[in-house]
Amino acid sequence: MKKALLLMILVLLCLPLVFAAVAEEAQDITGRCEFIAAPASQGRKADMQDHSYLTYYTGKYLEISTPENAPCFGLYLCFAGREAPYRVDAWQDGAWVTAASDARQYANSFLPLPGIRRLRVVPDRNDTLSIAEITLLGEGEKPEWVQDWKPWQGKADLLVLSAHADDELLFFGGVIPYYTAQMQKHVIVCYLTDQTSCRRNELLDGLWLCGVREYPRMGVFKDIKNNSLGDSYGFWGEKPVLEYVTGLLREYRPDVVVTHDKGGEYGHGAHRVCADAMIKAIDRAADGAYLPNLGEPWQIQKLYLHLYKQNTLTLDWRQPLSAFGGQTAFDVAKAAFDCHASQRSNGLIVQDWGPHANNVFGLYYSNVGLDEQGDDLFEHIP
């Protein structure tokens, strides 16, 4: 009895230490801060706190003072316009001193800070900065929704090539959340076309929800609206497109690749280009004589095309996933697509049924034989 009582007392004495070891989530102190705009700036504090990427502040710098008892330990910025390196200066002993910096040029950027009460956000180049959304955090653990993107490292298991932001969810459905978070595959998401800053912010929000933590590869080709493969190549140049796509394979070295329908789903020219260029890039990427400046040759193992009618497999996005607390891959893809607020008026929805069902793919190329079970992109790949 005495031993049991002693054990209980020891447990009770240790409980405060256990709870102290679990860091509390940092509080959002943005609303309690004072903002001082740079001369000749445009936009207001409210434009950076209205949950819209279409309104923003632009200026040479942005100065912020936090409450006396709440210094800033973390800064989360969602940029408008073209991303650029920036730094955070702290007011110290009567002068501005650099406290932290970020040269990665990410559209959504989190920067840990050492507990600052007066700070300035300054572009590292002789330029202005444009901020669509800002969050200042107090001491504690970063909230999960705050995106702390990491640079890509290593070799990919799966490369997803999407023509535009949101196509990766509309037409590939649960591929990204299922293989990234549930199956723990190393997934790189690449885009063909360049996007507006708003759409870059939205695509990052969606990918973060899907469990992606390494920054995606943003596209480089100006978006155009047409339904012709030839016209799209004519606008961008087939050679630059093939070099870009081949370069993706050599840089990320994926085993499996997923991209668009050869017919462009509903006929979009950029979707057609993704499929056509990837098909042509397979041999080019493996050929050491083809543009050796793009990196070491690489042979992919499989290429899946959306809706391809041969060697078809239908993936089940409706199974509960432990990685998402019981949500399905379909649930996650749908929630991620909802992040693309600028595209809600186009009438498209995430669907695993109908003529554009996002769970139907065909094995266009394989270096490891045909699928037998037909329920996994990585069948026959160790």
Q: What do these predicted regions represent?
A:
Residues 18-23:
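Sec-dependent signal peptide cleavage junction
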